UniProtKB/Swiss-Prot annotation:
Positions of disulphide bridges: C89-C104
Modifications after synthesis and translation: Palmitoleoylation is required for efficient binding to frizzled receptors. Depalmitoleoylation leads to Wnt signaling pathway inhibition.
SMART domains registered for this protein in UniProt: WNT1
One Pfam family it belongs to: wnt
One of the GO biological process terms: neuron differentiation
Function noted in UniProt: Ligand for members of the frizzled family of seven transmembrane receptors. Functions in the canonical Wnt signaling pathway that results in activation of transcription factors of the TCF/LEF family. Required for normal embryonic development.
Cellular component terms (Gene Ontology): extracellular space
Family: Belongs to the Wnt family.
Coarse class of the protein's main subcellular location: secreted
Residues carrying lipid (O-palmitoleoyl serine): S1
Gene designation: WNT-3
Protein name according to UniProt: Protein Wnt-3
Amino acid sequence: SGSCEVKTCWVAQPDFRSIGDHLKDKYDSASEMVVEKHKEARGWVETLRPKYPLFKPPTDRDLIYYERSPNFCDPNSETGSFGTKDRVCNLTSHGIDGCDLLCCGRGHNTRTEKRKDKCHCVF
């Protein structure tokens, strides 16, 4: 009688929240780069160099960018953004739906409304 032993190995992804948090940290510390063109034997070559040499140069594991993100606070027909003017925000939230962030620090108007809704309550 023979016995077999089977081993199965797999790599499990971390939960989605930790991946998002990691990417957000990378995004917040991304390095701005400048495109430089120079002539070499094979023709014109574009290379990236850090825009601010006082900061440490990015590693292979850092995020970099060479174009600024559009400003989503203001309307922009090129990007299709309507801006955040007249959006409803959450006064008590410190997240992305919070008034300070969503209104881009421009302040906000507070409106109180009373509504009557049928709730189909059973007592």
